[in-house]
Amino acid sequence: MASEKQYIAGVSGGSDSMLMLKLYQKKIACVVHVNYNTRSTSLRDQKLVEQYCQKLNIPLVVHTVDPDLVWKKNFQNQARKIRFDQFKKTAKLYQTNKLLLAHHRDDFIEQAKMQLDAKKRAVYYGIKTRCELYGLKIYRPLMKYWKDEIIALCRQDHIPYEIDETNKLPIYKRNEVRLEIEKWSKIEKEQFYIAICAMNKTIAQKLFVLMKKAKKWLLQPDVRELKRFSIIDQKQLIYSYLIYHKINVNGEKIDAILDFIQPSQQKQYRLQNDIFLMVKNQCLALLYKS
């Protein structure tokens, strides 16, 4: 990491983000905490983050969600949007585009297992250590640690943290996967992690070969030419096209984009809040709306 105080950091009050806050305090310009007001212990978590930021002398922005907000069916997606909207606002305020998040290796294998369970081909399995999303450069410095290692470090260095009791409840698919993985031995987790990393490496190598063949298409992304490739290659080409334009999307969105470019679909497809994909003169094009 480069110069001082150039990152904002998402901190929930859990062991992961509290360890990250302590380890990278000299790099953090401001902490963002979102209180969703969905648990009886939400205020407890907020107060812990407030106290620790005060102790470390780090500015804090707390975004409190209206307790009367009607949550949609997919709570996690809605919560993520709220969270990233606040990250973007705070990053703009501090004139940066760099964000620290505290995902770790258990999060990585949870995500990978969810992707495999869904039986959908992905261009990357798990969670990237670095990526770009919603105009923010995201860094995940704890990806080298397992959850139990993080807890051990917190206890060793007397770093306070709270526990989200709902993580143990099978109310979301991610929680179900987490509870299943908790039954695995450390060796099983390590083996799964290594296997996923190998899978990602193979995908990247295949993508490199594909890109050499498809340089012309990336310069002029004709949807008719795209359909001459296999479905897997189509997904990888769309992914590469968007990455080239600094737009990060997941596998589900790429599937939706493939559906979108078929005839008789809507004229524009929302990629991010103000970025839309469209088909113009039989070619993919991006539309930016302010």
From Swiss-Prot:
Domain notes: The N-terminal region contains the highly conserved SGGXDS motif, predicted to be a P-loop motif involved in ATP binding.
Reaction(s) catalysed (UniProt annotation): cytidine(34) in tRNA(Ile2) + L-lysine + ATP = lysidine(34) in tRNA(Ile2) + AMP + diphosphate + H(+)
Main location: cytoplasm
Annotated protein name in UniProt: tRNA(Ile)-lysidine synthase
Record GO biological process: tRNA modification
Residue positions binding ATP: S12, G13, G14, S15, D16, S17
Keyword check for Nucleotide-binding: yes
Keywords of this entry: ATP-binding, Cytoplasm, Ligase, Nucleotide-binding, tRNA processing
GO MF assignments: ATP binding; tRNA(Ile)-lysidine synthase activity
Intracellular or extracellular location(s): Cytoplasm
Family: Belongs to the tRNA(Ile)-lysidine synthase family.
Cross-referenced PANTHER family: TRNA(ILE)-LYSIDINE SYNTHASE-RELATED
GO cellular component: cytoplasm
Protein purpose: Ligates lysine onto the cytidine present at position 34 of the AUA codon-specific tRNA(Ile) that contains the anticodon CAU, in an ATP-dependent manner. Cytidine is converted to lysidine, thus changing the amino acid specificity of the tRNA from methionine to isoleucine.
Enzyme Commission number: 6.3.4.19
Entries under HAMAP family matching the protein: tRNA_Ile_lys_synt (MF_01161)
